[in-house]
Amino acid sequence: MEEIQRYLQLDRSQQHDFLYPLIFQEYIYALAHHHSLNRSILLENPDYDNQLSFLIVKRLITRMYQQNHFIIFANDSNQNPFFGRNNNLYSQTISEGFSFIVEIPFYIRLIPSQAGKGILKSYNLRSIHSLFPFLENNFSHLNSVLDILIPRSVHLEILVQNLRYWVKDVSSLHLLRFLFRESWNCNPLIATKKRGFGFEPKRSQRLLFFLYNSHVCEYESIFVFLRNQSSHLRSTSFGVFLERIYFYGKIERLVEVFAKDFRASLWLFKDPFMHYVRYQGKSILVSKGTPLLMNKWKYYLVNFWQSYFDLWVHSGRVYINQLPNHSLNFIGYLSSVRLNPSMVRSQMLENSFLINNAIKKLDTLVPIVPLIGSLAKAKFCNLLGHPISKPAWAGLSDSDIIDRFGQICRNLSHYHSGSSKKKSLYRIKYILRLSCAKTLARKHKSTVRAFLKRLGSEFLEEFLTLEEEVLSLTFPRASSTFRGEYRSRIWYLDIIYINDLTNFQ
């Protein structure tokens, strides 16, 4: 953020949000490459010499507005290998810098102003770490849940309209439209069959991640506005959404599906115990309300997507579950509310009687079937969960093979340490342990039985530790009773940095 403040002269940008001139600045692409998670396409081109000048950017933008791309590349491919190597390289080049530039208006609003307004307060923004206290403290007291899959296919023009408030110069919006069309035509992996623009996280670049987040932010801003049943929002960060172009016109269009009276429509969804949680492309609405209220919310969400985003959303994308009877697959856990029966003896004068009492308790389980499917996809076992060797790693040294298997096992154990039952996790450890043994036996051209017998019981001892070692570091002076109490469920705050199973492939 300090680099942006130093180079971009935020005082002038903050007044008009004119971003188009920044496209012609060389340092923009250096900053974009520095902050981007993916390597820049330009830096991988050996003929480019790791530079992007004003003249090249101007030529790229000029070529983008030509009507016949084939004639241009046919004439210039022999003269300029930079443009002739890949037909859509120019649009990807501009996309690298434009994805960084279009985020500037969002960065500006997160910077405390120098006029003494202080730090921006946001009451409705929460991190992933707030999910765990929510599960522990509130989940067991709720009854119904709406399991929502956020639609990922959005019309191109709707994405541009969502950014009209943040990016006000017309040139940048036209350039954004062109980049959309190029991505739609050149990359079928991110284009839907009809008119929508699909988001594939593993295939997307930084611009697509930003567009998807802005789309979800737009969806949540109006959703939270209607949820709060107020003409203004409590959070300062959400207040800017009330000033968007045609905002109130969109609100009136939304409520037409329920009734003409705006206040009467909002009263139908009044619920003081409604909780909204989103993680990646999935969100949940949890409430103490009746099934009738949850059906109203389901009907509202389907019509909300169809009327505001012009999306045909099937009602099957929103599931209604009762927590005491169903499990919720969320953030890698199968969460449910389990009734823990208990019996209390009560005595009044000379009479004594027994009272049956059921206490609701949060139950988090490891989803064994999806994990086995992930292991099978990564070639650690078959679909039935039987361990197999990893031929791709057979050429590594013994220590490297053990380290890779051990790292995956530690990551899984660390992430699923919040599970209340560890039996499924032990099965996953067993699969990885035996797969490692089979890989080493394959390398040394031996059988697994002979290989394990030769190494003894000390082989792969790191697969059997993990929770106990981490717990001893977390609570070094705790008693055995205290440690036993916390061994059942521990939420670690660094699980978002854990690599998945496919990182070593």
Curated annotation (Swiss-Prot):
One of its GO terms (biological process) is RNA splicing. Pfam families: Intron_maturas2, MatK_N. Disulfide bonds: none annotated. Keywords: Chloroplast, mRNA processing, Plastid, RNA-binding, tRNA processing. The keyword Isomerase does not apply. Belongs to the intron maturase 2 family. MatK subfamily. Usually encoded in the trnK tRNA gene intron. Probably assists in splicing its own and other chloroplast group II introns. This is Maturase K.
